């Protein structure tokens, strides 16, 4: 098979959801269909020690949340599928955002009893900003939930995207009978030995069943007043196909996967800082680092740089240019992933995610190219942290471990580091409290460095240009610091202090990140 054909086989997507909507369970079912796991375990297995395959970090196993982003790959129906599992917890939107820069589509999992929740909305905004297709899976039909028409209406009103139901539930909870599959023009049966039936047999199968009659009425209403199906609108991120089902009972998941792969896009091009777009079918290899993860294998204390291949083909041992430094690097120790297991990879193509063994060479956002190509991809977004803590080593004798741990976790993008301009004290910035807890846990367990953390509360952060810096600008209402790139930054105690500063120094430009 040619490289061109290999690239066209790739389907790379992320699963986004609010915590507990069933993201881990549906991921397991997809891996099951891809033949990667023998049985699709559920999160309930945590009591027995059979942890969900996509949750590998110790703290994830304890809490049942996805803190990091796993990458899982499998072959199915002639396609090579790459799933990026994103952290669903509200405190990890920064890492999630970067992960969403590396995919070509998103699958949004919604709890049908709860509808669109806060984190789903935040993550959807990120996806909408990129303009990539979104496919919706309304989960947990095996339990009583909200009316399907209400769910569609809320999805459209809250998220501002048109929807098109690919199938429709016949009852739910204990009365759940199956799905009326509009797209495939068939019935999918929840009970009995037969999985599918013809639509014309529905009146016989569900004679005198009020839920079937209700489903037919709803579908008639949607046919008359609903949105039209449009593949073009789906690919433009303007219309989301909606699938109903139950990941826990593995009902409707394979139908979703089959249909999703028909419409999910091939690998996208990616823009450079100069505004050019690099075509995936370009023969020259290029890619960017969207994540760095330390200690994926605690026995080896290693670091992996996750690279999204944008164009061409990776071959083991190839030499690449690192645009940021202007230096070359050899890609010899490279892996691909199946949750916590990984394998050395000989070659991979545009759309694939590879893990490059990193000794400190790479940073999040780095561009890799070959030959005389020296372009740079658009920078990945940075979140402005809201919460801050002072941090220091508890044991002076452990300074080396302390500094190594901080350096690696900061490069990984797990937390942001600021240094007080006057005192040299370290300050950590995060978008949520849980990031601090994970940082402390990992420093102690992975680097054997206990830390003392002192809350500083919420701060309003603004960057300034180095040429505008004057240390006399620092006052009791702000802290002058520098970020890990040595850029000057002010931490204001509140919005009032920010406005006071802006009035006093009108010529100083204050910059905010996302």
UniProtKB/Swiss-Prot annotation:
The protein, known as: Peptide chain release factor 3
Annotated positions binding GTP: 17-24, 85-89, 139-142
Pfam families: EF-G_D2, GTP_EFTU, RF3_C
GO biological process: regulation of translational termination
Family, per entry: Belongs to the TRAFAC class translation factor GTPase superfamily. Classic translation factor GTPase family. PrfC subfamily.
Family annotation (PANTHER family): PEPTIDE CHAIN RELEASE FACTOR RF3
Domain tr-type G: start-end pairs: 8-268
Stored Gene3D superfamilies: P-loop containing nucleotide triphosphate hydrolases, Peptide chain release factor 3, domain III, Translation factors
Gene source species: Streptococcus thermophilus (strain ATCC BAA-491 / LMD-9)
Molecular function in Gene Ontology: GTP binding; GTPase activity; translation release factor activity, codon nonspecific; translation release factor activity, codon specific
């Amino acid at each position: 098979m040619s490289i061109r054909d290999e690239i066209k086989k790739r389907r790379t997507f992320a699963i986004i959801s609010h915590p507990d909507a069933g993201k881990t369970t549906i991921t397991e079912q997809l891996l099951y269909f891809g033949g990667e796991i023998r049985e699709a375990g559920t999160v309930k297995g945590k009591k027995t020690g059979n942890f969900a395959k996509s949750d590998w970090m110790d703290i994830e196993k304890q809490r049942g949340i996805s803190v990091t982003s796993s990458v899982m790959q499998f072959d199915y129906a002639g396609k090579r599928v790459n799933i990026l599992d994103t952290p669903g917890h509200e405190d990890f939107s920064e890492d999630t955002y970067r992960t969403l820069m590396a995919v070509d589509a998103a699958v949004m999992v919604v709890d049908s009893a709860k509808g669109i929740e806060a984190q789903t909305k935040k993550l959807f905004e990120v996806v909408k900003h990129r303009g990539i297709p979104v496919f919706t899976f309304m989960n947990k039909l095996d339990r009583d939930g909200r009316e399907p028409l209400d769910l569609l209406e809320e999805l459209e009103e809250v998220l501002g995207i048109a929807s098109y139901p690919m199938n429709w539930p016949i009852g739910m909870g204990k009365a759940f009978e199956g799905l009326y599959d509009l797209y495939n023009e068939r019935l999918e049966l929840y009970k009995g030995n037969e999985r599918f039936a013809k639509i014309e047999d529905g009146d016989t199968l569900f004679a005198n069943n009020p839920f079937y009659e209700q489903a037919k009425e709803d579908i008639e209403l949607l046919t008359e007043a609903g949105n039209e199906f449009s593949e073009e609108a789906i690919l433009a991120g303007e219309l989301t196909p909606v699938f109903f089902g139950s990941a826990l009972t593995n009902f409707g998941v394979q139908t979703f996967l089959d249909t999703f792969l028909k419409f999910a896009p091939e690998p996208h091009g990616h823009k450079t800082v100069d505004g050019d777009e690099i075509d995936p079918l370009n023969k020259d290899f290029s890619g960017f680092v969207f994540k760095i993860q330390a200690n994926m294998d605690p026995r080896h204390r290693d670091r992996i740089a996750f690279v999204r291949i944008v164009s061409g083909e990776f071959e083991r041992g190839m030499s690449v240019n690192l645009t940021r430094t202007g230096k070359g690097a050899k890609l010899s120790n490279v892996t691909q992933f199946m949750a916590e297991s990984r394998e050395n990879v000989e070659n991979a193509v545009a759309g694939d995610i590879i893990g490059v063994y990193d000794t400190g060479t790479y940073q999040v956002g780095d561009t890799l190219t070959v030959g005389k190509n020296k372009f740079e991809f658009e920078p990945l977004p940075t979140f402005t942290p809201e919460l801050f803590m002072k941090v220091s080593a508890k044991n002076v004798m452990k300074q080396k471990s302390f500094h190594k741990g901080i350096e690696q976790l900061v490069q990984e993008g797990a937390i942001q580091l600021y240094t007080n301009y006057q005192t040299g004290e370290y300050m950590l910035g995060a978008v949520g409290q849980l990031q601090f807890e994970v940082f402390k846990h990992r420093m102690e367990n992975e680097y054997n460095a206990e830390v003392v953390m002192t809350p500083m509360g919420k701060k309003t952060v603004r960057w300034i240009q180095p040429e505008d810096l004057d240390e006399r600008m620092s006052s009791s209402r702000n802290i002058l610091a520098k970020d890990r790139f040595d850029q000057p930054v002010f931490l204001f105690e509140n919005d009032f202090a920010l406005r006071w500063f802006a009035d006093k120094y009108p010529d100083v430009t204050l910059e905010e990140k996302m």
